[in-house]
A protein has these predicted regions:
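Amphipathic alpha-helical interface segments
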Residues: 1-68, 83-127
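Long, charged low-complexity segments
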Residues: 71-78
Length: 127
């Protein structure tokens, strides 16, 4: 389960890398790459949540950050629903901050199921 949390963190790290190096990677389809990283992020976070709380989705979704993670996974990542409303971000940094808050909340909610020594140290990294 820790692997999925670390993979979700690496998705954020990759978006940080894109933001910091946008002038060097501008010839790539960045919109598609960022969307792919976000999709993987939400799927990985939900794997951690589902494995940590297999029968308590309704209860943990009382937390608005957790509810937003499931919303993205269920309405946009697993399949695109007609009623899906995407979050609008003016800058990649806004998206990064939102995702950081979300993964930190996943760590809090799932702390009893994860190793004690796991940390979320974000670094600019292209995987």
């Amino acid at each position: 389960m820790a692997k999925y949390l670390i993979d979700a963190k690496k998705n954020i790290d990759s978006i940080i890398f894109i933001e910091e190096n946008i002038d060097k990677v501008c010839n790539l389809n960045l919109r598609r790459k960022v969307e792919e990283l976000r999709r993987e992020f939400y799927i990985n976070c939900c794997v951690v949540l589902d494995k940590s709380h297999p029968k308590n989705k309704k209860k943990i979704c009382e937390d608005k950050l957790i509810e937003a993670i499931y919303y993205e996974r269920d309405k946009n990542c697993a399949h695109r629903d007609d009623d899906y409303k995407s979050l609008e971000f003016n800058q990649l940094s806004d998206m990064i901050e939102t995702m950081k808050h979300q993964i930190q909340q996943v760590l809090v909610v799932c702390k009893d199921s994860l190793p004690n020594n796991i940390t979320l140290d974000f670094v600019s990294h292209d995987k």
